């Protein structure tokens, strides 16, 4: 979804107090359009991560007004992302393209249906199945689903993800963040919220990420201590 002339998010007079009485945000105003690129700088403890959590809808204990236009998807990279420890790296990354994989699975199921006598001996069933297959193939073609394996491998290589067969439970914190970032970028949400995305990335991966975000059609809000990265992206 896109409408670069429409404000899709608005925050008015938002404040946040941590018990017993520590104010981390005070009277914050923020609005942005689809496609906006926003960088957030601040001292440690200034409430940057809290601000992202409020935008993501993960923190609702604040004062003020937050308005999100319905129909826009949000993706959030937290500093300590939650991943299924029992899954492999490849399985987690594939969660980012779950809808695309469903298209391919449905297409394979249709092909199996053609092999059944009760289908290929019935002209009406064959016609309906062929029509369904044609519509599905159009979706697959337009989404680039045929190249999904190459897409996954390129993204994992670009972010220097661990071996695809490794279990999440054995990964370091930095490796988990790279896997989570890879999954999130493949999801392509309308709004990307990135909390210190360059942490644990090498220079080649940072350069790749800069290019990816510069070409990203949706809105991007980044918290980062890396001013050069922010200058290159926002």
Listing of model-derived features with the role each one plays in the protein:
Residues 1-234:
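ABC ATP-binding cassette signature C-motif
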